[in-house]
């Protein structure tokens, strides 16, 4: 495709900006100089965060050589963040894996052996032997999978089918457990359905933005650019930012609030009290569309049952609640006075009042945004519920320019982990394994015997680590994630299980990550546009892309790996006789035939692909695998408020926001005139609940699982930086991004550094009760912690900060709190 004049000018502008910054943009600038005809362009969503920016990918001679923002993409409108401009280089690191590697000694597998190249058949041989042995000796609960919010939609769907229907094990969980699980449970408790009701179009219509534990300037920079434009172009627009430390988003804030860790719960209840005391309740909305419930308290911290905190909890893991009156709710929040809140949070009273006034003002359209500050929290579900309370009390929800919005961090945490249902307790379209009706729906659609899908919830992410350590989980396959670096409490709860000789660990990844190097078998994986894919972003937008280049060497997509491995198992080897007796026609068939090469999935011929269109999996199998899997999966949500468009529509569009009914996407759910599931005259209907009403929960402040004391005297918070994404397995292989932020540092208040005889640039040992790492003191820069708190990013494999973190989780969502543990510092 030729570059248009608009694209030419945009490319040169990008090149000029990059030159000014001392960077070299891969492709776009070079594409406009003498090679316009040679480069082929096609659309794709960005490989990084959950914003879902659209990019144009330029390929030449079988390689991705260029990338630019897609001017027709409604999310980013042609703009990329710094990571997006370097997308081509993530695929071509010098250490890209191109063949399977098995730990071997003397020509055979050995847990202590060296990684040795083998063939795919040899890799599947050893995997088959390990899986079959575990299934025969200990049953389905002895095998597990850890997947990803970076899986494509059909990869997650194929994995879920293989484990839940094929192997009859619900021990499959995504890394989204570490980032979005609290948001999921929060949505389900309050609304009965997952995912936001609003969309990014709210930004241009809002009067106020409140960020709760979200550094959008670095983590969602394209959305932040839209918020910045809205704020700077309208003097009446207000931005409030709440965090436990000062970061780049504070630069735009009219009200920048730094609070004591965990005390966001106090602030949320104070605002609810303020709304009530100032008669700011939207009485019409509240009386028609809201119920009130009091939640169980003292629910523990998701630690091992033997931990003292779990033994002391009165209602460990309880999500119980009971109806309550408005007067009781009013009395409950009345305890959270301005004075008490200021004392508990350390926030000045005037700042608290300014914040509360935004929500209480009936003429202010308010959007609440949050990410990991809320979700990675031992009371993360409660925090989600409590922010919904503010919008439900005021009726500021499901309308243009106002509403609560949970931002996601991975490109398909919504589309794959949540919507497909790759969590240990979920099935497609918000269905769950504990519901017999839901299991029956899936079993009938998949044409498998009734009773195949287990009713017992499988092991969640942290429980998988513990089960590996305890020898209960023995074969473990991780895909598209680097949990040995990203997960909590590496020393005590993860590494022991991975290196236990009783266990066999498989890692599928494009690069030799910390996880891969700790495994027994490494499978080289195709990435991004080396396969056909689909992601679902934070605003319910499903986006497709075509395969545009082939993977290097013998690297294969996660989808190929799952489907081909399923050929190794016949139904008699994985299902008991009582199940086979219900469907005798399935005897002797492989799981490939039962799950993937079915009449339902294989009915779309490969001839639907253009003659020159790459699609390695479908051309090898002889049918359009991705289309078949997607259409089967989409069936579950159609007619139930999760409607997805037909497969072919997505290749033509720049994404569509579900529910898509009669060809029309939905911008705002639950409100009349916007949502096709809300009838005329209903006004609002939260149809995830049987009575159509959302729930306001009374939930108190409860302390963190671990706080500073005399010995471990500092809070530690962990997170990300703009230049790197998660564990840096892709971005650190981009030279320009690596040079921009080459190693992790410990951000610390200058007075805390001085008190410990530390200076900027000094090496420092950071020590918790679980481990220690060496880092570099940073008293300046983008992050400015208050006294008593230090901040450290987790992208650096040489500084595994998660050796320090505690594996405490929200007891309801099972999501880890990476934001709060206690450490001490020692000068090196």
UniProtKB/Swiss-Prot annotation:
Its cofactor is [4Fe-4S] cluster; Mo-bis(molybdopterin guanine dinucleotide). Residues 39-95 form the 4Fe-4S Mo/W bis-MGD-type domain. [4Fe-4S] cluster binds at residues 46, 49, 53, 81. Keywords: 4Fe-4S, Electron transport, Iron, Iron-sulfur, Metal-binding, Molybdenum, Nitrate assimilation, Oxidoreductase, Periplasm, Signal, Transport. SUPFAM superfamilies: ADC-like (SSF50692), Formate dehydrogenase/DMSO reductase, domains 1-3 (SSF53706). Predicted to be exported by the Tat system. The position of the signal peptide cleavage has not been experimentally proven. Its main location: periplasm. One of its GO terms (molecular function) is iron ion binding. InterPro entries: Asp_de-COase-like_dom_sf, CT_Nitrate-R-NapA-like, MoPterin_dinucl-bd_dom, Mopterin_OxRdtase, Mopterin_OxRdtase_4Fe-4S_dom, MopterinOxRdtase_cofactor_BS, Periplasm_NO3_reductase_lsu, Prok_molybdopt-oxidoreductase. Component of the periplasmic nitrate reductase NapAB complex composed of NapA and NapB. Belongs to the prokaryotic molybdopterin-containing oxidoreductase family. NasA/NapA/NarB subfamily. HAMAP family: Nitrate_reduct_NapA. This is Periplasmic nitrate reductase. It comes from Shigella sonnei (strain Ss046).
């Amino acid at each position: 495709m030729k570059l248009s004049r608009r694209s030419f000018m945009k490319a040169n502008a990008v090149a000029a900006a990059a030159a000014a910054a001392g960077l070299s943009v891969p492709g776009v600038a070079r594409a406009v100089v003498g090679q316009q005809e040679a480069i082929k362009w096609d659309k794709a969503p960005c490989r990084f965060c959950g914003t879902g920016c659209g990019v144009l990918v330029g390929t030449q001679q079988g390689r991705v050589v260029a990338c630019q923002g897609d001017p027709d993409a409604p999310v980013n409108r042609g703009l990329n963040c710094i990571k997006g401009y370097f997308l081509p280089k993530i695929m071509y690191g010098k250490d890209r894996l191109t063949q399977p590697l098995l730990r071997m000694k003397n020509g055979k597998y050995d847990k202590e052996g060296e990684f040795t190249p083998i063939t795919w058949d040899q890799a599947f041989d050893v995997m088959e032997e390990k899986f079959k042995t575990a299934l025969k000796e200990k049953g389905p609960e002895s095998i597990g999978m850890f997947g990803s919010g970076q899986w494509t939609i059909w990869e997650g769907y194929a994995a879920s089918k293989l484990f839940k229907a094929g192997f009859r094990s619900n021990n499959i969980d995504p890394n989204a457990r570490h980032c979005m699980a609290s948001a999921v449970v929060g949505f389900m408790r309050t609304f009965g359905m997952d995912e936001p009701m609003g969309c990014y179009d709210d930004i241009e219509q809002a009067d106020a933005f409140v960020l709760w534990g979200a550094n959008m300037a670095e983590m969602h920079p394209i959305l932040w650019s839209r918020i910045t434009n809205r704020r700077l172009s309208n003097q009446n627009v207000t931005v409030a930012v709440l965090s436990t430390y000062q970061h780049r988003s504070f630069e735009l804030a009219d009200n920048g609030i730094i609070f004591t860790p965990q005390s966001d719960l106090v602030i949320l209840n104070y605002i609810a009290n303020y709304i009530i005391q100032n008669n700011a309740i939207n009485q019409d909305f509240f009386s028609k569309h809201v119920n009130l419930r009091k939640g169980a308290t003292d629910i523990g911290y998701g630690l091992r049952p033997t931990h003292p905190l779990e033994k002391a909890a009165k209602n460990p893991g309880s999500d119980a609640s009971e109806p309550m009156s408005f007067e009781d709710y009013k009395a409950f929040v009345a305890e959270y006075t301005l004075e008490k809140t200021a004392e508990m949070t350390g926030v000045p009273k005037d700042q608290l009042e300014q914040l509360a006034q935004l929500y209480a003002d009936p003429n202010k359209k308010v959007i609440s945004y949050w990410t990991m500050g809320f979700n990675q929290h031992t009371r993360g579900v409660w925090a989600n519920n409590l922010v919904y309370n503010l919008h439900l009390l005021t009726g500021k929800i499901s309308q243009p320019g106002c509403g609560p919005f949970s931002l996601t961090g991975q490109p398909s945490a919504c589309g794959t982990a949540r919507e497909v249902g790759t969590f240990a307790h979920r099935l497609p379209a918000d269905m769950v394994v504990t519901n017999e009706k839901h299991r029956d729906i899936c079993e009938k659609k998949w044409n498998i015997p009734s009773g195949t899908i287990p009713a017992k919830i499988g092991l969640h992410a942290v429980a998988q680590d513990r089960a590996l350590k305890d020898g209960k989980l023995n074969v473990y396959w991780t895909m598209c994630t680097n949990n040995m670096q990203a997960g909590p409490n590496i020393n005590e709860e993860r590494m022991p299980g991975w290196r236990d000789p009783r266990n066999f660990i498989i890692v599928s990844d494009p690069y030799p990550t910390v996880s891969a190097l700790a495994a027994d078998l490494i499978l080289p994986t195709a990435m991004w546009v080396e396969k056909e894919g689909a992601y679902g972003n934070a605003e319910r937008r499903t986006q497709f892309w075509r395969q545009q280049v082939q993977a290097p060497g013998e690297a294969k997509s996660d989808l190929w790996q799952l489907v081909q491995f399923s050929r190794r198992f016949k139904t008699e080897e994985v299902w008991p006789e009582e199940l086979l007796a219900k469907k005798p026609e399935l005897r002797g068939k492989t799981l490939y035939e039962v799950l993937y090469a079915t009449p339902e999935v294989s009915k779309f011929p490969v001839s639907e692909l253009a003659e020159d269109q790459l699609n390695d999996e479908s051309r090898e199998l002889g049918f359009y695998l991705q289309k078949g899997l997607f259409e089967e999966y989409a069936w579950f949500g159609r007619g139930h408020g999760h409607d997805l468009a037909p497969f072919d529509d997505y290749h033509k569009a720049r994404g569509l926001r579900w529910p898509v009914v009669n060809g029309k996407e939905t911008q705002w759910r639950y409100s009349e005139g916007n949502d096709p599931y809300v009838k005329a005259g209903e006004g609002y209907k939260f149809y995830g609940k049987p009575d159509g009403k959302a729930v306001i929960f009374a939930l108190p402040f409860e302390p963190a699982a671990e706080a500073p004391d005399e010995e471990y005297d500092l809070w530690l918070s962990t997170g990300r930086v703009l230049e790197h994404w998660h564990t840096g397995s892709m971005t650190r292989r981009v030279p320009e991004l690596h040079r921009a932020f080459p190693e992790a540092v410990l951000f610390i208040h200058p007075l805390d550094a001085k008190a410990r005889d530390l200076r900027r640039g000094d090496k420092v040992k950071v020590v918790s009760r679980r481990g220690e790492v060496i880092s570099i003191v940073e008293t300046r820069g983008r992050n400015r912690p208050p006294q008593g708190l230090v901040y450290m990013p987790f992208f650096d494999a040489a500084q595994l900060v998660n050796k320090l973190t505690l594996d405490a989780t929200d007891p309801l969502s099972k999501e880890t709190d990476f934001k709060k543990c206690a450490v001490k510092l020692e000068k090196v």
